[in-house]
Amino acid sequence: MLFFGLYGGLETGVKDRTSYVLGQDKIRLVLTTPLTESSPINDHLRKHGDGVKVVALWVDDARSAYHETIKRGARSFMEPTVESDEFGEVVRSGIYTYGETVHVFVERKNYKGIFMPGFVEWKSDYNPIATGLKYIDHMVGNVGWNEMNTWVKFYEDVMGFVNFLSFDDKQIHTEYSALMSKVMSNGNGRIKFPINEPAEGKKRSQIEEYLDFYGGPGVQHIAIATDDIIQTVSLLKARGIEFLSAPPSEYYKAIPERLGQHMEMMKEDIAKIEELAIMVDADEDGYLLQIFTKPQQDRPTLFFEIIQRMGAKGFGAGNFKALFESIEREQAKRGTL
């Protein structure tokens, strides 16, 4: 599916906010701005700036998901609510997770429209063209000091997720900073939520910088999958997207050693990968290619990752040091390291 857009606002009966839905393949991003000073969205923007408020999850039964998670200790964001139009009805409910981030459960089995009630098709003057992005691979949250295990337990006990992978400060560190991370996943592995917390280091880590500028815990980055990262990144760069700086040339010379047996199946040209500053890593199941944007708003908070998996199930552990050194170079420019 190519890029499409939808609009919801005053003309569609929504009186307190305006929203634009940006879609490509299985990706749906809803960009919302408040229309009134008293809107709770304004409170969120004043404290956090632009960022992710709602992480929506598709469920078979939004009522059951809500009541079960509340019974297990979740804090309510919205009780089950039915919204309808000529295409049917959507049931939504929601709970809070870390910080002021919420999970909204969306039940769409009785809805035949393209998105949700309250939205109409929007034709963009920018004439957008698809860039090969497919779906959200994972979404990473940053939490405060010594809070990671609390939220790991939340996802285990309340959401029924499992701890898929764990990384400590011995694995994720540079000369100056460190962090710890645990990856939570649902039963089929389709949903993956890594949770990061700061660790002791000589200087301020990227997690501490995020917490300071975002005003607390929140979504650090959204990883979006592609089947052809070279084409996708080339198109994004041509349209002005800025990515983190490339690792040193020694990094790319070591790719055959890093990939080991998987080097035989690698089709991508290493020179082109280096030209685009794409990073490569491997695990026992295959290899992956990934690259990270700079923050997409004025505050150094939310950014995006583009990832192509060639069998690998991990998160590029072999790239952690090179990635975080690149982030630290950006922090040094901002004077926040």
What are these regions (language model features)?
Residues 1-121, 138, 145, 149, ...:
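An N-terminus-focused feature that recognizes amino-terminal "leader" regions
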Residues 1-28, 71, 80-86, 93-96, ...:
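Core segments of cupin and vicinal oxygen chelate
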Residues 22, 29-31, 41, 51-55, ...:
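Short, structured motif recognition centered on aromatic/hydrophobic residues
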Residues 52-55, 112-152, 162, 215-224, ...:
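N-terminal beta-strand motif that seeds the catalytic metal site of vicinal oxygen chelate
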Residues 105-111, 197-199, 307-311:
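Short beta->alpha transition motifs characteristic of CBS
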Residues 188-209:
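Active-site-adjacent "gating/activation" loops or surface patches in catalytic cores
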Residues 191-193, 215-296, 302-309:
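Long compositionally biased, domain-poor regions of proteins
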Residues 290, 299-337:
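TerminUS-proximal long segments
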